[in-house]
A protein has these predicted regions:
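A short, flexible beta-alpha/helix-coil linker loop
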Residues: 89-91, 134-137, 179-181, 241
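Alpha/beta catalytic barrel-like cores
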Residues: 14-127, 136-165, 169, 197, ...
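Loop-centered beta-sheet repeat module
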Residues: 176-191
């Protein structure tokens, strides 16, 4: 399926699908100058004089922008799409910290880094996506949790705006419904009510993924109760469907999710179960292959070994294709 390239990680895709790197590059963490993200806890931040805390936090956020730029360039070099990390801006959306980006002493440098990211993305035409954490639940009964979700989703959508990502499903923001309190109709209505509070560009990017737990939202439930009421595209996750098929074959579930994306190229998710008692746990590497059923979409690899797993899978596919 791939042409061999005499470089440690480069490969050329012989079809339109691109594989997706999720957040972290393990290959770029190797060597003397590892590209690693940095964080800061609120306990650490609040234990310092505010000016010192803001300076440290600003330096860490700037580091995260530099690392993100390195990873996006790496993805461009290796024909991959990229899911930006949801931990790039520690504490910025945390209420108790009460921080705006403008408060950081290196704010101008951070703005310059946004410009650099935008140029890297535009020059290399790398597809960018985002998958905010599982704690973002628009259908929650907890109003504080919903407010935090709206703040978080709007913030990351505005960041995607700032770095030049289109406000549509070419740059999707993927979340789960993650709620089963009430009937499906009630849950969908709560979701819609809170979805309507999001910024327009955030609404234009949001897509919903099928769940892996038996008491949550399968592809069948999403197609039956959610999609008809919202027309929001559905992200098909191979492993989640294997854990919670709800009577649908993989082919039917994938094809039906594919159709919800309309004229946009879907971005789906692939992983496999780690050996053990929990089938939902993600494996380090892929030991199997997947079936596209003749459809064209991009595919985020949600395997623990990140880009090392993508390279390993690509090499196996090339060997099988020879």
């Amino acid at each position: 399926m791939y042409n061999r390239v005499e470089a440690p990680i480069l490969f050329t895709v012989l079809h339109n699908m691109k594989y997706g790197l999720c957040c972290i590059s393990l290959n770029l963490q190797d060597g003397d100058n590892p590209a690693k993200f940095q964080t800061m806890t609120y306990k650490r931040f609040s234990g310092l004089p505010r000016s010192e805390a803001l300076s440290i936090l600003g330096d860490r956020i700037l580091n995260n922008m530099v690392v993100t730029d390195q990873i996006i360039q790496y993805c461009a070099d290796n024909n991959m799409v990229y899911r930006i990390s949801s931990d790039l801006f520690p504490l910025i959306t945390y209420d108790e910290a009460n921080i705006e980006l403008e408060d950081l002493p290196n704010y101008d440098d951070i703005q310059d880094s946004f410009d650099t990211l935008a140029q890297t993305i535009a020059t290399n035409d790398v597809r960018i996506s985002c998958h905010p954490s599982e704690f973002n639940v628009l259908a929650s009964l907890n109003t504080k949790a919903v407010d935090k979700t709206i703040t978080e989703l709007n913030f990351y959508s505005s960041f995607m705006d700032r770095i030049g990502c289109p406000a549509n499903y070419e740059s999707p923001m993927n979340i789960h419904i993650h709620n089963k309190h009430g009937s499906n109709k009630e849950i969908v209505q709560r979701f819609i009510n809170n979805f309507n509070r999001l910024d327009c560009n955030c609404q234009s990017r949001l897509v919903i993924e099928n769940d892996d737990k038996l008491n949550c939202w399968s592809v069948r439930q999403l197609l039956t109760d959610f999609y008809p009421a919202t027309k929001i595209p559905l992200t098909f996750d191979y492993l989640h469907h294997a854990c919670h098929p709800d009577g649908m074959t993989e082919q039917t579930a994938l094809e039906e999710c594919y159709m919800t994306w309309g004229n946009y190229k879907p971005l789906f998710h692939y992983s496999e179960s780690r050996p053990g008692n929990n089938p939902r746990a993600h494996a380090d590497y892929a030991n199997n292959t997947f079936n596209t059923y003749g459809l064209d979409f991009d595919l985020d690899f949600e395997l623990k070994m990140k880009d090392k797993a993508i390279l390993n899978f690509s090499q196996q596919e090339f060997a099988h294709a020879r």
